[in-house]
Amino acid sequence: MNSKLSLSTKLSSSGKTQLAEYFAKPPFKVITLPSYDDAWANGLNAMQMSSSPGVLAGDVLEIDISLAKLTALSLNTQAFTRVQAMNEGDSAMQTTHILLAENSRLFYLPHPLVLHKDSVFKQQTHIEMGEQSELIYGEIVAIGRVLNDERFAFRQFSSHLKIYTLQDDGKKRPLVSDCIQWLPSKMNLTALSQMENYSHQGSLTYLNLAKNNAEIKQQVQALQQQSAEEKDLLIGISQLNEYGLMVRVLGCRAEQIQKLFEKIGRLLKSV
């Protein structure tokens, strides 16, 4: 199935973020949510939904998100995405394109991916950031249905994240390039420095083009202090070369990583 979700934002006359254009091809759907207490006071809260039982063999999913100048969007998902079992030679793919205009802000934290036995899933995420824009983007993936004794029973998982800043001359300058490639039949993914005995991995990328390295360093230190209180999680926080930081987490419960990323998101929104 070829499925597509496309949405863009605009600023209302009262200075609040609204949906400008919205198109969804099943099983995708987006609903807007009431405004809750949030550091992004004029932002829009929305939920990405799906009527499908999961990602199936041959599925091609495309997501396009475009934020207008001065708008802010917090986008979550409804539930876990399950990548279902596939026949040998089959696969599914998702491509996400995100464009952040000048002074726009996006928080995007999909629920975890669960890789079922014999599944193959490839995803690519491309993000372009305008001047002084801000991004909080998370990914969480489970190595299988652990309670069903499925650990690394999938065939392949790959995730490529590329983030660029748009320069005055129209050219794109790379800020982040991150790649996860898991091939259980060819890799020892339980080895030291890999997944070891953990069953879930999470990555959270934060970029704020309005902040300098000294300000980012303060945020890294604050998050490191906060993460010291977390139990049963292996957490690493690194400052990027410029404008941001990355959090990498290993754990045994998806909900624990999800709540941690939501907590970090609230903190980053407020500074």
Curated annotation (Swiss-Prot):
Example GO molecular function: nickel cation binding
Family matches, as InterPro entries: UreD (IPR002669)
Cellular component, GO, one term: cytoplasm
Pfam families for this protein: UreD
Location(s) in or outside the cell: Cytoplasm
Domain of life, source organism: Bacteria
Segments traversing the membrane: none
Keywords for the protein's UniProt record, in alphabetical order: Chaperone, Cytoplasm, Nickel insertion
Keyword Cell membrane in record: no
Family classification: Belongs to the UreD family.
Record-given protein name: Urease accessory protein UreD
Species this chain originates from: Haemophilus influenzae (strain PittEE)
